[in-house]
Regions:
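Feature captures the catalytic ectodomains and active-site-proximal regions of enzymes
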Residues: 1-362
Length: 362
């Protein structure tokens, strides 16, 4: 049983374990240690790695905002739509873009199925059969939805209890802590309260009612895809405020606000370097993409000709709580700035927890 808690970094879960009785009991009964996330440290990249067992270069899902040359568009990969029209969710699919051809490596579900192990995925109801689920979970045996936290834990318990005589891998994803951390900032009262409710549901709706026979031989894994770092409004860099920087770029930055992929105009490399050094020293690091690839930042594989255009010429990596946004204009109902974010390489973003505990031992 793998429960993935979006944006719950290693330090966050460790601190909660000092106060929460359920988590403290699990920590004492199991094994708990930090892992490093993928780069960029963001959900779509990490979930694809979890469900394929491949590094980002191995599966090709390299960021939240990507240039797709075959479609001639910069796409928002959460909405699966052009960035300029991301409100038209999944419009790429209407153009004939196929999720199964975007990530082509075999999925975890297929490998487990070949070994006689069934897989069940629990995710938010609107995501059960959407385009992203067709990427992440395309080989899963069953996809089941939930409405909220309570039925997530109940559905998870029922799935485990019904499969006592079978080998089973079940994965549940919960994203509320990530959403609250984006809006209010990480490690705030809002995100801490949400995480306490996660643990309360784990105890009351999953662990306590789970029959002893279902606990036997069941391993619970609690993990996360990435952490978050505070990104205060005063640390935002708006590209629209830097026309000289805009002039050096062929396209708007892609990737992540804290790990941007830059496509540079011919003859503008030195101008770009000078501008970043003069205006963003101590806030961003400019790194040639080829150097990042050689260093294995995206994984040990070499990029295929189809993947390399997705990465641009340079990476702009945030060092502190900065982020690079295109403009100050936001849609109606959106917060002016996300006060927590991820994507870069700081410990708060990259260190994630793994708690492993046998349920017949608690």
């Amino acid at each position: 049983v793998l429960v993935l808690l979006d944006a719950v970094g290693y330090g966050t879960l460790r601190r909660l374990g000092e106060a929460d009785p359920t988590l403290r009991r699990l920590l004492r009964a199991g094994r708990f240690f930090p892992l490093t996330s993928v780069f960029p440290s963001t959900t779509v990249v990490a979930l694809t790695t979890i469900w394929t067992g491949r590094a980002p270069l191995g599966h090709g899902f390299l960021g939240t905002r990507l240039l797709l040359p075959e479609q001639g568009v910069v796409a928002d990969m959460l909405a699966l739509a052009p960035v300029a029209h991301k409100q038209d969710r999944e419009s790429l699919l209407e153009w004939g873009w196929e999720p199964e051809r975007f990530v082509t490596v075999p999925g975890l579900g297929k490998r487990l199925s070949d070994q006689g192990i069934q897989t069940i995925v629990l995710t938010f109801y609107p995501y059960v059969n959407n385009g992203l689920s067709r990427i992440f979970h395309r080989d899963a045996g069953k996809r089941r939805g939930y409405v909220g936290l309570s039925d997530l834990w109940i559905n998870l318990r029922e799935a485990v209890a019904r499969s006592q005589a079978e080998r089973l891998f079940v994965n549940a994803y919960w994203g509320e802590v990530d959403a609250l951390s984006h809006v209010y900032g990480p490690d705030t009262e809002h995100s801490r309260s949400a995480l306490r409710y996660v643990m309360r549901g784990l105890e009351e709706d999953f662990l306590a009612p789970l029959p002893a026979s279902a606990r036997e031989g069941t391993l619970l894994l609690l993990a996360a895809d990435h952490g978050q770092i505070p990104t205060p409004a005063e640390r935002v860099v708006y590209l629209s405020d830097h026309p000289v920087l805009q002039e050096t770029l062929l396209l708007p930055p892609t990737g992540e606000p804290r790990a941007s992929f830059l496509y540079v105009q011919p003859g503008q490399v030195e101008r770009l370097r000078s501008y970043i050094a003069e205006h963003f020293a101590g806030r961003f690091v400019l790194l040639e993409t080829d150097r990042a690839l050689a260093a294995g930042l995206f994984g040990p594989e070499r990029p295929t000709p189809a993947l390399r255009p997705r990465l641009g010429d340079f990476l702009l990596l945030a060092q502190d709580g900065s982020q690079l946004l295109l403009t100050k204009k936001w849609g109606a109902g959106k917060p002016p700035v996300l006060l927590g974010h991820h994507g870069s390489l700081t410990p708060a973003e990259m260190l994630v927890p793994l708690l492993m505990v046998r349920l017949d031992g608690v």
